[in-house]
Amino acid sequence: MLVSHRRLAGRRGFPRASGPWALDSGGFTELSLHGRWRTDAATYATAVRRYATEIGNLDWAAPRDWMTEGSVLARTGLSLSTHQRRTVTDYLRLRDLAPDLPFIPVLQGQSLTDYHHCADLYERHGVDLATLPLVGVGSVCRRQHTAEVEAIVRALTARGYRLHTFGAKILGLDRYGDTIISSDSMSWSFSGRFVPGCSPTHRSESNCRGFALSWYRRVTQRLDFSPHTDTTSTSTVPQAERSGPCSTAKHPPGGSPARAGSAPATPPRPGRLSPAKRRPPPKRTPTTGRRHHRDRTQRPWTLRCC
């Protein structure tokens, strides 16, 4: 699960996470609304440390990156190259402030040349992206040209980078999903806005855990992904979620519908997923260590809650 810093900031307390999760900086919303980051690097690092300590199981955290969509550039009044430099500088600053926290570098750009330039900026500052467990690819979630994104992703993969694509489209994952480590999506929440709630407490399904898991299954089946067996559980999907879409108002025992942005805790989590890709899956060893250290064939599809 990918949770936004904007949803967690200011909360007095948090539940403990029952499984690994990742933190999104909420940068697109922050820059779109305010044209700048109102939180400095030190304050953000302090917040991330609190999440890692109090929630636990933090797999990785995005830096205070600067997106490069046209609407964001218009709002900040800065150039694309300035956004790239600030993204790199912020990662370096966070790494110096909190070397023990799992911040990942993020590449920003519009064209393929832009992304190569951003990668070169990291390299010139001594960051060997090819040795890192994960590198984010930003500013792709609103792209309508899937072939263009595919060219960017494949070119970055050719440089030896293990990629997480922020908000990649499902049509895109059909084409280049075999080259990335992970991706995330809020499509389940957007589509759920137009579905009546499954219980009296739900006006719609936009924040419903059962609806999210049902969407998750449909997408992974469409992408021809097969479940990866969770080494800590005998089931990859809670039994109460197997019967179908969230139309019966039945949620897993002990769990309640997850609200967008809530910390990933208490409810049983679905197992991780890896692709079958129309050929027999390779032999796997039990998953150990941090989630993004696993074999590239074991890629999750992450539900974004932000």
Which residue stretches match the model-derived regions?
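Eukaryote-skewed repeat-based solenoidal scaffolds used as protein-protein interaction platforms
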Residues: 49-183
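Low-complexity, flexible helical/coil segments
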Residues: 15-16, 33-42, 56-63, 95-99, ...
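Non-catalytic, usually N-terminal nucleic-acid engagement modules in DNA/RNA processing proteins
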Residues: 1-89, 241-242, 246-271, 275, ...
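Alpha/beta catalytic cores of nucleotide-metabolism and tRNA/nucleoside-modifying enzymes
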Residues: 49, 96, 124, 151-163, ...
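Short, acidic/turn-prone active-site loops that include or flank metal/cofactor-
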Residues: 7, 26-29, 139-141, 186-194
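Generic structural signal of hydrophobic/aromatic residues within well-ordered alpha-helices
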Residues: 44, 48, 115-119, 215, ...
